[in-house]
Amino acid sequence: MSGKTYRATGINLRRMPLGESDLLMTILTRENGLVRAVARGARKANARIGGRTEQFVVNDLQLYRGRSLDQLTQAESLRTFPGLLQDLGRLTAAQYLAEGVLQEATEGQAQEDLYDLLLVHLERLAATPSHQIAARLVHGVYQLLAVGGVAPEVHFCTVSHRPISAESAGFSVEGGGLVALECLSHERVGFRLDIEQVAALQLLADADLTPASLDWNYLWIGLERLLRRHIEFHFDRPLRAATLLEICFEPLAVPAAASPQ
């Protein structure tokens, strides 16, 4: 293998048409972080590599380093998630996670933790019942933010730094997390959360949700909006998948779990 040729294991996050028959792939790899590579001829009807370029396919890849873009020369499929394609809500939630990862991930350095965590949450989403998608999405979003060091603070007041437990609180997007009630005058607060909402937010820091909490749809739908605001503020760009997600969650929605001020 030449010095310009390398191998990696990656999850396809995005694909865009390029020229008449090529695809521009954006792939999260364990070994090199985000890789942007051209798949030559991948859009042709008889392309051998075609199906391996679909979104969320996990491949063993061989790539060639180019001046501006790498080239995808070989791909061997290791894993697919057919469950994501069977439900629009699951697929949209997975695209939401992918969009967040695209904002968070870096190029040219290993991203093992981010890669492994995304794989876990895609597996959970692909297998989850439709009525638990909101829970799986919100937990995945928080966990992916945490591994990147940009998750909001959910256990301590961001003003006084005292622990917050079993109580109502505010949430400041600009301040990066929860604000104790006695500190509300010192921080701009975009959301007011009751005890249940604070407890649900704090559960997101655990490795997995409790079985009972998976059915707290009205809480998770509200907290998705809160985390969305946090992501959009931190990365200074909107999450496009959120628009379709609102439509998917509309039948489940009741009064919002996190109320913007």
Curated annotation (Swiss-Prot):
One GO biological-process annotation of the entry reads:
DNA recombination
**What Gene Ontology terms describe where this protein resides (cellular component)?**
bacterial nucleoid
Superkingdom as given in the UniProt entry: Bacteria
Q: Which InterPro entries match?
A: ARFGAP/RecO, DNA_rep/recomb_RecO_N, NA-bd_OB-fold, RecO, RecO_C
Q: List the SUPFAM superfamilies hit by this protein, alphabetically.
A: ArfGap/RecO-like zinc finger, Nucleic acid-binding proteins
Q: Which UniProt keywords apply?
A: DNA damage, DNA recombination, DNA repair
| Pfam families per record | RecO_C, RecO_N
Functional summary from the UniProt entry? Involved in DNA repair and RecF pathway recombination.
Protein family according to the UniProt entry: Belongs to the RecO family.
UniProt xrefs under PANTHER family? DNA REPAIR PROTEIN RECO
What is the name attached to this protein's record? Answer: DNA repair protein RecO
